[in-house]
């Protein structure tokens, strides 16, 4: 939503929609209802959004959201409004307690916190909070051909500029090829410390 309401301040995404859908499927979710978010949608009141999406759109019977969930114009809707409107429409609404990180003053696990750990290069915390290894998918592009001169295969990846990336540094990683083969890799993000240029 921030890409529409405040594009200059929109945070980078952790996972692209295509990959999210794959993860949903891997975890047994059979149906996903994608809502196109645009300027008109951003100005929709919470009650109108509820009627259009939950009632008329998908004919929901149960709605589960995080206890801090907000929606509608200027985030006017919350779990209490959902429960109120849901009661009128015969929809049961549950607010799910936030998952807390017991190691960091019981702070809630959120995409904002994960992005902060990424910026600090704290990949163990990123992976722990995601519940999976952080990953990128990119197209191999031409580089300077250094790999052949050092006897170690290298690949330069073009990464989507909308994706959040870790702090500059060298990371231990896994690389998966199109054929499904998985190999160990060293990933350098940022400058090339080995070469003067």
PLM features per residue range, with description:
Residues 1-8, 111, 176, 188-191:
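Short intrinsically disordered, low-complexity coil segments enriched in acidic
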Residues 1-58:
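Core alpha/beta nucleotide-donor-binding catalytic domains of modification enzymes
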Residues 4-5, 140, 157:
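Short clusters of hydrophobic/aromatic residues that line enzyme substrate/ligand-binding pockets
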Residues 18-24, 50, 128-132, 139-142, ...:
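Short low-complexity stretches enriched in small and charged residues
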Residues 36, 67, 97, 189-191:
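Short secondary-structure boundary segments
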Residues 42-153:
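Classical nucleotidyltransferase
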Residues 143-197:
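Phosphate/ribose-recognition catalytic cores of enzymes acting on nucleotide-derived substrates
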């Amino acid at each position: 939503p921030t890409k529409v309401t405040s594009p200059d301040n929109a945070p980078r995404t952790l996972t692209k929609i295509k990959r999210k859908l794959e993860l949903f499927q891997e975890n047994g979710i059979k149906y996903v209802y994608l809502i196109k978010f645009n300027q008109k949608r951003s100005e929709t009141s919470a009650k109108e959004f509820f009627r259009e999406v939950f009632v008329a759109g998908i004919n929901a019977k149960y709605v589960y959201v995080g206890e801090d969930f907000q929606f509608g114009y200027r985030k006017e809707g919350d779990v209490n409004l959902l429960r109120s409107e849901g009661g009128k429409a015969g929809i049961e609404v549950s607010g799910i307690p936030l998952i807390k990180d017991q190691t960091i003053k019981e702070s809630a696990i959120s995409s904002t916190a994960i992005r902060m750990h990424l910026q600090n290069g704290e990949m163990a915390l990123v992976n722990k909070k995601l519940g999976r290894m952080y990953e990128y998918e990119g197209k191999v592009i031409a580089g300077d051909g250094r790999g052949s001169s050092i006897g170690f295969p290298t690949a330069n990846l073009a990464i989507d500029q909308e994706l959040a990336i870790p702090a500059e540094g060298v990371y231990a990683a896994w690389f998966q090829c199109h054929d499904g083969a998985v190999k160990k890799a060293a990933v350098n993000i940022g400058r090339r410390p080995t070469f003067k240029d």
